[in-house]
Structure formats: structure tokens, C-alpha cells
């Protein structure tokens, strides 16, 4: 299965202008300019721990708030993943990771099934980390699942520091997605008994 799997999505609305370029078979390099520094930090961790190369540029109505920008980044990242994976032949499909970050621990379990679904079970977080509103994290994940064709279960297992909990979550997302997107040398076709995803 030669070639680097790569997908690019551009989205322009009255609220945002976003370009996402994702290389699944990458080295963990990230070039991020979203205007939302904390999200840049989280997506950099996602890239490093998943060995994904991610280029992301975003302009949004941040004078209102970051909601539209964060959600549309999830849309574009999910769409870029779907494009990069194509028909999903030969991939492992499932991934799971548990990641500690100091006192916090989080798990992400996912299925690249083309059946978008999000389970988000995270303890109550501080309302903000810096200027970033933490209620936007499930909005990001929901959009990512919908446009990436993924079922994703996110669990903040425990922790007291909001930054640490979210950092563990995004690292776990990278590691779980790395597992799920790898090729299984025992399989050449679609990873489903139905023959399609």
C-alpha cells in the first residue's frame, strides 16, 4: 500500500475561512495558525503523538467568540481525514489509547466505521483555560466525528487540572487514531464483515 495518504479541505463561510491539510503517514509535524492558541497547542500534541503532519490555517469571527472557528476546524480536520483514508481498505479501523498527564488520565476509543457518533464523558472542567472556552471541546469532537466518519468515545477518567485533562485527551486522540489508520498486513479489503463501511 504505497504512497502517503493525504487529504485537504477548504471551507469558506460568512463566519470562517479554513484550510486543513492532513497527512496520515507523517512525522508528527504541525503548522498551525488558527487564531486560537490553546487549540493550536492541543492539535500540535495530536499531531506529534499520532505521527500526523497537519497544516491548518483559520480565520474566523473571533471578535464574537471562538465557537464557529473551533467547530469549523473540527469539520475540516474530519473531512481531511476522510479524504486521506479514501475507501479505508486495509486499515485496522479500531484504536484505543489511555494517556496520563500528571494527576490526570484520559482515554479515547474510536472506530473508523463511517458511522459518526460521539460519546463525551469528561468531568466538569474550569470554564476557561486562558481565553479558551472549554465547552468548545465537545463541539470540536462532534464536528470531527461527523465529517471524519468516526465513532469516538472520549473519557476524562480523572484529574483536577483542566489543562492536564484536555492535554491527555488530545494526546490519546492522536495515539488512538494512529492505531486505527495503520495498515493491517493481514487484510487487503474493507475491514468489515459487510464488505463496506
UniProtKB/Swiss-Prot annotation:
One GO molecular-function entry: imidazoleglycerol-phosphate dehydratase activity
Main location: cytoplasm
EC number, as in UniProt: 4.2.1.19
GO BP annotation list: L-histidine biosynthetic process
The organism's place on the tree of life at top rank: Bacteria
Keyword Cytoplasm: yes
Cellular localisation: Cytoplasm
Name the record gives this protein: Imidazoleglycerol-phosphate dehydratase
Organism per entry: Syntrophobacter fumaroxidans (strain DSM 10017 / MPOB)
Amino acid at each position: 500500500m504505497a504512497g502517503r495518504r493525504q487529504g485537504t479541505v477548504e471551507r469558506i463561510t460568512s463566519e470562517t475561512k479554513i484550510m486543513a491539510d492532513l497527512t496520515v503517514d507523517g512525522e508528527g509535524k504541525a503548522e498551525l495558525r488558527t487564531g486560537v492558541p490553546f487549540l493550536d497547542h492541543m492539535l500540535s500534541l495530536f499531531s506529534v503523538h499520532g505521527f500526523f503532519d497537519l497544516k491548518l490555517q483559520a480565520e474566523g469571527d473571533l471578535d464574537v467568540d471562538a465557537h464557529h472557528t473551533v467547530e469549523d476546524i473540527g469539520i475540516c480536520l474530519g473531512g481531511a481525514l476522510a479524504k486521506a483514508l479514501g475507501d479505508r481498505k486495509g486499515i485496522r479501523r479500531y484504536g484505543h489509547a489511555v494517556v496520563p498527564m500528571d494527576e490526570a488520565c484520559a482515554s479515547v476509543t474510536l472506530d473508523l466505521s463511517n458511522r459518526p457518533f460521539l460519546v463525551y464523558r469528561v468531568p466538569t472542567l474550569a470554564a476557561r483555560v486562558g481565553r479558551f472556552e472549554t465547552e468548545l471541546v465537545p463541539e470540536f469532537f462532534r464536528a470531527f466525528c461527523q465529517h471524519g466518519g468516526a465513532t469516538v468515545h472520549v473519557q476524562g477518567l480523572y484529574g483536577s487540572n483542566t489543562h492536564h485533562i484536555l492535554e491527555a485527551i488530545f494526546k490519546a486522540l492522536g495515539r488512538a487514531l494512529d492505531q486505527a489508520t495503520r495498515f493491517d498486513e493481514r487484510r487487503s479489503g474493507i475491514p468489515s464483515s459487510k464488505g463496506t463501511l
